[in-house]
């Protein structure tokens, strides 16, 4: 029995694809690390879908290879990528999302990737990553997501923090507690349970963070009085 298992292990090693490691460098500073796999039938003359898998809280860019996502990608002729996101507890803050965006761009510059077929998947903290990235990146001139799947993903960071009586990782990366910087918790969440009408900020890619915050605050003030305004109008 042991001999058979050992043989199967050797076969799996022989059949597995090479995993490459790359570093995201901006202005001579190493910002992040990510790994990727090229399918065995890769053809640079045709475009290939890209599957991005995100690690769970406490994981890293290699954690996703303990799943079957990489194998499924290889079987389908898809390129597979797994980002670190700057830290093992990043909770998909804006900086981590920017890293992922730049890593996708690097992959597009170095491999023939179908920009209309970029998919994201993950579990727990990583399960929400694709949904959060999709919500925050709607500029058609930059990498967008065609579809995303979440396994037990953390959907509402504000609710999660409240239920945990605070979350040190979120405080670290969002810049404060849920009641101090609610905007950061909302835009780094997949949804906002309290009111689905407020679930996502309006994505205006050319506004800076300050403008985003003003817009978010204005929307939150206006939403409760819209029904009254509608009722009073002739």
Regions found by a protein language model. Give the residues of each.
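Alpha/beta-hydrolase active-site loop
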Residues: 91-111
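Sec-dependent N-terminal signal peptides
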Residues: 2-16
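Active-site-adjacent alpha-helix of alpha/beta-hydrolase-fold enzymes
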Residues: 172-180, 203-205, 210-234
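Primarily recognizes the serine-hydrolase "nucleophile elbow" in alpha/beta-hydrolase
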Residues: 109-110, 116-166
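Short substrate-entry loop that stabilizes the transition state in hydrolases
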Residues: 42-92
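A domain-start/cap signature at the N-terminus of enzymes
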Residues: 16-48, 125, 166, 183
């Amino acid at each position: 029995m042991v001999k058979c298992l050992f043989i199967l292990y050797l076969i799996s090693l022989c059949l597995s694809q090479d995993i490459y490691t790359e570093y995201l460098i901006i202005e001579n500073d190493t910002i992040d690390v990510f790994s990727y796999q090229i399918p065995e039938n890769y053809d640079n003359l045709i475009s290939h879908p890209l599957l991005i898998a995100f690690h769970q809280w406490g994981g890293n860019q290699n954690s996703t290879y303990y799943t079957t996502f990489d194998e499924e990608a290889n079987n389908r002729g898809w390129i597979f990528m797994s980002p670190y996101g700057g830290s093992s507890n990043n909770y998909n803050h804006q900086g981590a999302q920017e890293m992922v965006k730049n890593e996708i761009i690097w992959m597009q510059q170095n491999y023939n990737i179908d920009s209309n077929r970029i998919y994201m998947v993950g579990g727990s903290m990583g399960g929400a990553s694709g949904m959060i990235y999709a919500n925050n990146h709607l500029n058609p001139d930059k990498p967008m997501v065609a579809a995303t799947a979440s396994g037990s993903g953390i959907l509402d960071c504000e609710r999660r923090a409240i239920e945990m009586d605070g979350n040190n990782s979120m405080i670290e990366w969002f810049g404060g507690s849920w009641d101090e910087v609610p905007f950061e918790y909302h835009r780094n969440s997949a949804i906002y349970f309290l009111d689905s009408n407020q679930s996502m900020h309006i994505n205006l890619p050319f506004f800076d963070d300050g403008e985003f915050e003003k817009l978010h605050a204005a929307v939150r003030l206006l939403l409760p009085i819209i029904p009254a305004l509608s009722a009073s109008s002739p």
